[in-house]
Amino acid sequence: RLPGSLVQPNDKNTAIKAALEAGAQGLIFPMIESREQLDQAISWATYPGHDDGRRDGEPLRENRGVGFCRANAFGRDFDAYMRDTAPRIFLVAQIEHIRAVEDLDAILSQPRLDAIMVGPYDLSGSMGLTGQFDHPDFKAVMARIHEACRRHHARMGLHVVQPDPGELRRQVAAGCRFIAYGIDSVFLWQAAARPAGV
């Protein structure tokens, strides 16, 4: 079961802090292209001592401010939140650029990372193949991502933009463990395009 998660700007400490203080139990960092970007985003989402993604010899770099807020019932549940909830915030890196694929082994080796999610339109666009999901080069990149996730025992998610049950089954069979299926606007225009049946 995926906790309630918010997509957060990965370069905005204040937005990440605000989402967590409001009670979000998961964050999706968009457009992560490198391990360094991911480390920075995770540092803003974790309290000192809660990030086990440090490389040997690195100092503590967690930057989440500590205070009473909605997430810890304005202090009433502070100790329980710090002990039980904060260390388990579900953290997802969106893979939306070919540069991220080039650094994927480093990204997937971040111990605090819980999953990645592929944004196929942006990823294909970064390859000069916007929306060409059947192109051999795009398929090869997707296979490379799946293989890297298997190698690192990492959870992989995907946005299946067009609601296609066959594609959904294929992606689950390929190993995707969570899928954003469709977009509200796509569901609406597809439903509106069907005959009324009256």
What are these regions (language model features)?
Residues R1-V198:
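Expand to "…catalyze enediolate/carbanion chemistry for C-C bond making/breaking, isomerization
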